[in-house]
Amino acid sequence: MKKTITHTLLLFPILAMGIQAQEKQSSPNLIFIMADQWRGDALGCLGKEAVKTPHLDQLASEGVNFTNAVSSYPVSSPARGMLMTGMYPVHSKVTGNCNSATAPYGVELPESARCWSDVLKDQGYELGYIGKWHLDSPYQPYIETSNNKGKIAWNEWCPKERRHGFSHWIAYGTYDYHLKPMYWDTDASRDEFYFVDQWGPEYETDRAIDYIANRDNKLRDAGKPFALVVSMNPPHTGYELVPDKYKEIYRDVDVETVCNSPIIAPKGTKMGDFYRKSVLDYYACMTGVDEQVGRIIRQLKEQGLFENTIVGFTSDHGDSMGMHEHIGKNIYYEEAMRIPMMISWPEKIAPRRDSTLMIAFADLYPSLLSLMGFKEQIPAEVQTFDLSASILSLE
């Protein structure tokens, strides 16, 4: 009898560990897909621009599509800093783009910041980051990439201690040569970057699919939930650096039919000609990114993970592209500030909902953590808003 009791007592910790593992596995996975410089109106399902995005249209129909989402500071690094910290730039310390001009002022994501990824790491999540990071400032001697050879250096490696819980890492700082992108892998040192003869979003999706499928059972612990960020650079400039198969989709579009707006300057003007030269390639980039989103979702379904995975798609900011006589972002017109934002979670989020709620890019920090069951773990210093109830259609 004593022996039986002893054996039973010894089993209790093992059983408890098993139950705990099951509880962790029941937590939702997260796939967060982010583009760069994608205007909020540029989705096929909205019918406002001549862009084709069938996979994103489908994703929008499977969850909630926020049609008034905004980037509070429509510049890459500050927006990304707000997303990661849930704090506005004066508190996140990312007050401008991370480059050699801002580096002397300490403009980069602090190692001490408590990011949403740090919270998930502490809750037992496996974390992966693939693509553009742009939250570390370059330091001398600058790495040998072409965008570090001008007056301002842009590109920098992110060492492990600054990755905020992401243990699987295939990323770069900022590098806009989309047809021959460069990366550092997880264990690479600063000088061990490599270039790929493949369109960036396609390569990043290949690697994301490997992570989701957990190729060779080596990329993550299959017994734990995971969160994966796929940060694609297009449709950021250069717009023209996109595979021909996507350009071909827009070959027969009369560009003047997409320039019928009073905020687009006339043909023959500097800004008007820039828009006409760029817009169809911009759409081609979006259609290409859309195809990669479809591949990621297909892999989730093939692995039986889709139902309990939160899938989010958004952008750090929009793009003026010559509208309002302005090229680029960093301007408070809708074309620069408004962004796409959609969230799907088949187990919890009702489908086919368009929401006019004005949600900010940075609100995703507390909203996603709360949605995933970690409301109590949101740091007190987070300044943005938990809108998870609106995502779940509870208010």
Give the location of each predicted region:
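Bacterial N-terminal signal peptides
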Residues: 7-16
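Formylglycine-dependent sulfatase
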Residues: 2, 19-395
